[in-house]
Design a protein with these regions (language model features):
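Amphipathic alpha-helical segments typified by the pilin-like N-terminal helix
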Residues: 1-19
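Short, well-structured segments within or immediately adjacent to enzyme catalytic domains
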Residues: 15-201
């Protein structure tokens, strides 16, 4: 009975997390409509701050800590208020498999496969990601993915170039949000660099 209850609880948390990402996806689309089709990426503009006015709950006092949608119910440390990472990853060409960090807004129309390309995902808990409790926290800007070692299939764990997308949050994989606004679950070892590109090979 207990294993069955644990499995049911995990399934419920996974569904709740997916719903969070769906809601964030709606906010992304509404924000883009108001800002010439562009969305924030990187550290110049913090995504979880600019999307607050478009959220159906919380954020009315301009405090991102009140937006429950930003919290994955399966995140191990319940004090964490931002449980997702966004993509600030860009590439010089389709042959570039390393890429670089971008900190400028990006037009949604730049993404050739918006239903398949990842924008936001479950973030890994670990030494790279401290608990964020306020805007002055040292780790407030550690919320993005911009290197192959950051994705869920990576085995690296150091603070800077270690895995930033969870590899086991929900039954062996993360939930992810795509640029088109659709969200789904995927196996950690199936995540590839190409899934983060503006232009696919």
């Amino acid at each position: 009975l207990l294993p069955a209850l644990a499995k049911a609880k995990a399934a419920g948390q996974r569904a709740s997390c997916l719903n969070n990402l769906h809601q964030i996806g709606l906010a992304v689309q509404m924000y883009a409509e108001d800002y010439e089709g562009k969305i924030p990426r990187g550290n110049n503009v913090l995504w979880f701050l600019v999307y607050m006015p478009y959220m159906p709950q919380g954020g009315t006092d301009r405090d991102f800590r009140s937006v429950k949608i930003y919290r994955c119910p399966s995140y191990p440390n319940k004090k964490q208020v931002i449980c997702y990472v966004d993509s600030s990853w860009s590439f010089r060409s389709t042959r570039d498999n390393i890429g670089f960090e971008i900190n400028d807004p990006t037009p949604l129309e730049n993404f050739q496969r918006p239903t398949e390309t990842i924008y936001i995902a479950d973030n890994e808990d670990g030494p790279w990601r401290g608990i964020v409790t306020g805007l002055r926290d040292e780790d407030i800007r550690r919320h993005d993915v911009w290197h192959p070692s950051h994705i869920s299939s990576s085995k690296q764990t150091d603070p800077t170039h270690g895995r930033r997308v969870s590899n086991k949050r929900h039954n062996g994989g993360p939930n992810v949000l795509h640029y088109a606004g659709n969200a789904d679950w995927m196996k950690a070892d199936q995540m590839t660099v190409d899934m983060w590109r503006e232009k696919w090979k």
